[in-house]
Amino acid sequence: MASKLSFKRMDSIAETMPDALRQSRYQMKRCFQRYVSKGKRLLKNQQLMEELEKSLDDKVENEKLVEGFLGYIICSTQEAVVLPPFVAFAVRMNPGIWEYVKVHSDDLSVEGITPSEYLKFKETLYDEKWAKDDNSLEVDFGALDLSTPHLTLPSSIGNGLQFVSKFMSSKLGGKPESMKPLLDYLLTLNYRGEKLMINDTIDTVSKLQTALLLAEVFVSGLPKYTPYLKFEQRFQEWGLEKGWGDTAERCKETLNCLSEVLQAPDPTNMEKFFSRVPSIFNIVIFSIHGYFGQEKVLGLPDTGGQVVYILDQVRAMEEELLQRIKQQGLHVTPKILVLTRLIPDAKGTKCNVELEPVENTKYSHILRVPFKTEDGKDLRQWVSRFDIYPYLERYAQNSCAKILDILEGKPDLIIGNYTDGNLVASLLSNKLCVTQGTIAHALEKTKYEDSDVKWREMDQKYHFSCQFTADMISMNTSDFIITSTYQEIAGSKEKPGQYEHHYAFTMPGLCRYATGINVFDPKFNIAAPGADQSIYFPFTQKQKRLTDLHPQIDELLYSKDDTDEHIGYLADRNKPIIFSMARLDKVKNITGLVEWYGQNKKLRDLVNLVVVAGLLDASQSKDREEIEEINKMHNLMDRYQLKGQIRWIKAQTDRVRNGELYRCIADTKGAFVQPALYEAFGLTVIEAMNCGLPTFATNQGGPAEIIIDGVSGFHVNPINGREAGIKIADFFQKCKEDPSYWNKVSTAGLQRIYECYTWKIYATRVLNMGSTYSFWKTLNKEERQAKQRYLQIFYNVQYRNLAKAVARAGDQQARQTTTGVAPSEIVVRPKERKPQTRMQRILTRLAGQKPPVSE
């Protein structure tokens, strides 16, 4: 096959393609004439291949050409712009590696072009005036990263932490003076003004090495469990402060680790040392849109897996922080704040409570800060994530003041979530000079095809002009980016990843991104989350099963009557159940699954279908996409006459009961299906597999990495519903013939989870990132400052104007409420009077200033 051909990175397509064209000149002339015959247009990969095959009459010649080098190039082309007589190709030979060429259809001459030139070529299809304007806005973030080291191998993408450790080892190795940046960094470590690890008496690398040697010899002579307090005074005599460990043995390990780094740094010791550095105590996490809460929120608009992810993340990170702080020998109380929006019209949730403890944690809270209308009142109602942009800058200012008050100082790490949370995290990290991590969860640009070049058509509804601009700002501002899978960053051999789609793109009439984000940037890291195993455990663990919930679940699945909670019924309860649970929107593709089922008679004969998704009545929803999908669901149930075979249950918010629901589906020997058009990760896939359910999941995105196809589950192509339906039906037919096959797949799925997906691994990795990147960014401070200034300009001249143009939903209603927000509708945390230090007063004053636009 053409896709199996080798291609050396050093080879240039512009150099090698002319010879290949000459060897098949007659056939390729016909092919290119066919490409240009229909005038200017954009051709996707499948269209390119179809046109190539149609232009070749001889089957043997066809196969020879398709299997050869030219076939390989066209197979690797993601899209081509046709502007007769030219055809410009965007060729992606490997993940993250792009080359652009244009071919003259008459003489088959080939010319290499830059990403910017290709984008101008493409813009001509949509806005020729903009494309030809020499002064059209072009942004090139890559030009500001020229001295930043980058990974080079596609297989290494996402291993940023490992790469950074290697590079730091190389840069700091050699002469003792090269270690000065590390010494300077260690001298900055403190907790509320109290020095950690070393004090100012150690002002040279040689003094540090001497102190380490003396201390290591000393603790080597002590019983290994001797508490730090027993020898704290001796350490201080050598210029060493607390933070090395809680026992003599732990101190010895940390001392030795740093000594090894200073003597001959290597990546392993470098990463190990920074995992022990006491630099992170207080963390702020932003998740702004939707209804963020701990109960009665799942299934509400813009509220789904991200909420579950963050709550589990917080519990895991607090547990890891507490363990680290204890092992560091410190008596410090860590704090984690999840910043979200306070919504006065809370719809029966606690989203109107200002400060709420996170369940099953000691020191973590949800802090809710309201959006403000233009006249300063609290915005009462929910706002779609697509309409949120006019509120974010002021929200960042108000959040900053609250954070500094509650934490009594700056946080040590800020993590953003989704576009809105990442933008606000960028604003605050720049304002407070704090290390920033970002998590996309989903990048809308990849969900909607051609949403960049066709942004005008979608902007009134989705405001992608704001969203894509905000995404580019936060990606480039962030110190590190957390992803759940490789595919999220760089996709697969055939298809670019979410982030890779932002490498070079254009929004004609708005902005051209000659370089947006480079997936070889060492800021990219993969940290796969897990599932809460106290809730999601195998159906075979009978002693833990929540049998008290079985009557409720039985009614939910099998009662015959339509209610406000469910419609449809299952006439034959002896059939296995295929089950799906997700938000009811286009991308989650629940209606697609219903259509697959409705079209496949064999599948309908073998199994029942149960879906948990959204609301059942369109009149009860305010979400545009959900309303469309609700109506589509009703139409599909009528069209395929599914009553008796389908149960549609409205969104369920009780995670504990949902865990038992998964297990009850497993009791029927059923399966879980995740049919999304694209899924960045797939928490429900992890949950289902944790419960022992054989799982079918989309091959578009993260689930393709979670599941080993045919072993621990199955991949389905959401674009080909008939094929997906056949694959699911074949599985159940095989299980009917061989019942042990179901158990085999179930067991393999559980094994996959236990080997790869736990929250403990996740929390350890993310905290290591926070510590390591805090030092890493000091090594290229000047370049980083230059890029921040560039980003500040871009924020001010581009994003701010775009955000102002978005209508402020609900402002008129808020103005009509003359008394503002009724006190009974917002639960405010008790006021605490604290004496403020001079530094706290300064920080509080800073909080009142406008954020200097971090990105």
Curated annotation (Swiss-Prot):
Protein purpose: Sucrose-cleaving enzyme that provides UDP-glucose and fructose for various metabolic pathways.
Entry GO terms, CC: cytoplasm; membrane
Keywords linked to the UniProt accession: Cytoplasm, Glycosyltransferase, Membrane, Transferase
Molecular function terms, GO-annotated: sucrose synthase activity
Localization in the cell: Cytoplasm; Membrane
Top-rank taxon: Eukaryota
Phylogenetic lineage: Eukaryota, Viridiplantae, Streptophyta, Embryophyta, Tracheophyta
Alphabetical list of InterPro entries matching this protein: Glyco_trans_1 (IPR001296), Sucrose_synth_GT-B1 (IPR000368), Sucrose_synthase_pln/cyn (IPR012820), SUS_EPBD (IPR056736), SUS_N (IPR056735)
Database matches in Gene3D superfamilies: 1.20.120.1230, 3.10.450.330, Glycogen Phosphorylase B
Region (GT-B glycosyltransferase): 279-758
Entry membrane topology: Peripheral membrane protein
An example Gene Ontology biological process: sucrose metabolic process
Tissue expression per record: Predominantly expressed in roots, flowers and immature seeds.
Record's protein name: Sucrose synthase 7
Organism: Oryza sativa subsp. japonica
One Pfam assignment: GT-B_Sucrose_synth
Main location: cytoplasm
Similarity comment: family membership: Belongs to the glycosyltransferase 1 family. Plant sucrose synthase subfamily.
Top-level class of the enzyme under EC nomenclature: transferase
Catalytic activity: an NDP-alpha-D-glucose + D-fructose = a ribonucleoside 5'-diphosphate + sucrose + H(+)
Its EC number(s): 2.4.1.13
